[in-house]
Amino acid sequence: MKVTIVELVVWLFSVNFFVVVAEESRWTLVDDHYGKNLHESVCYLRCLSNALNKLYSEGERRLFVNEEVYANASRILDDMEGKTGESTTYLSVVSSEMGGENNKLEKLISYGNAMGDLVAKVGGLFAEVNESVRAVREEIPSALIRANKYYTAIAEITRTVWDDVNRPLQQDKATCGDQKVTGVGELKTECGAHTCPLSDGVNESALQKYKGGCLEINVMSGSVSECFNLPRNKLYRSVALSSSHGFLKWYQDEAKRFQLGLRVKNIFGPLIASFGVGQPPSVLAEMINNITSLQSRFNEVHSNFTSILLADNLTADVDNTDSTI
């Protein structure tokens, strides 16, 4: 997934608001009450970034499959309509030339009708594909951009929190001016199942597992490294606030406190709806299989139609119609 400008529905609260204990919180709360710490915060954040990545991948695949099936179905329908039109034109020209050969003429008419029926069936399926790709083109590209921005923002926050978790357990030096916030490799913290309500699926039902539709992280006992929090504060203010169009607020008055709130339902709800438009890949696969099957039957009928024409040595009349039959 490509990194783009951060746009995240995140808000951060003042210190006084966060003195409320976990039992009184209106949202899913991860704090340092009763010995909790940043390790669990990383797990909750990583769950969100993984879920966004999964949504992005599935949305990208839905868009690609819709476009691919549309292109194939359109090509097949155009070919069938072209051959049917040529056959109809030729039939009207040669019917008078066949004289009393009513049996062959009836067969040609029957084959022509069969081709028309098959074209109509493929046309009906194509109309469904067309409606699906129209909806997908309208919704999914912009949803992919939003998902990528949210993913980028949450992944960056996760990375900077992980800097704290990974640091040596020792007091920070008094001077932190040269401290840099950098990546530290793979997360080695073990995460309990309760830290990822979205692990079994990113859907409305899973979002209900977040109390109040939100996640709040509140670490105030000094577990946060001042040396990491100062550049993090600068990073969020210079990058996130300048490009988030008001969706991100950061109030960081204490260098050793980490306070973060995410409107999980507001982030994922619209994305789930947008990525749910159009037909899913499994349905599209069945539709293109049906279209291909109808095309095979059409080709058989068309072959029978042309065989009668060639057997009666009427190719000269075909040339006169400028047909490619």
Curated annotation (Swiss-Prot):
Q: Which domain of life is it from?
A: Eukaryota
Q: Which UniProt keywords apply?
A: Glycoprotein, Signal
Carbohydrate attachment residues: 72, 290, 313
Signal sequence span is 1-23
One Pfam short name: ESAG1
Q: What InterPro entries does this protein's entry cite?
A: ESAG
Task: Please give the function described in this protein's UniProt entry.
Answer: Not known but may be related to activation of the variant surface glycoprotein genes.
* Name of the molecule in the record: VSG expression site-associated protein 117A
